[in-house]
């Protein structure tokens, strides 16, 4: 399933705030991204069609709720990166992310633990996935 950058922004708001009315989403997204009402309605319709959101009529508004969980979205994002980035470049991508992002000491210790466990199944050479 492909989710556009704009659709990710909509999902992030619903994950953070919980279910939202179309009116509330339009207000937030118009203000934050300067998107038109029709653009937002199109994004919402696409997310419903992709089964990322549910839509229920309530009075004059629709209520949108997330069907796609943040955990499932993380899996989609990881797969998307694996599909788009040469497998020989993943190490550098991870290093760049670590350099560019803020982490607590506990976060970094957790990353060290993941790396330690991964060493047990390390390969001698990473094969290119580009061809």
Each predicted region: which residue ranges?
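Pre-recognition alpha-helix immediately N-terminal to the DNA-recognition helix
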Residues: 5-13, 24
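Conserved segment of winged-helix/HTH DNA-binding domains
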Residues: 69-95
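Short acidic, hydrophobic short linear motifs in intrinsically disordered regions
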Residues: 20-28
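Short, hydrophobic-biased segments on the C-terminal half of alpha helices
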Residues: 44-45
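Glycine-centered, phosphate/nucleic-acid-interacting loop/turn motifs that mediate DNA/RNA or nucleotide
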Residues: 51
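Short, cationic-aromatic polyanion-contact patches
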Residues: 3-6, 58-77
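Short helix-coil junctions and helix-kink-helix linkers
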Residues: 27-35
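C-terminal regulatory/oligomerization modules of transcriptional regulators
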Residues: 75-76, 99-131
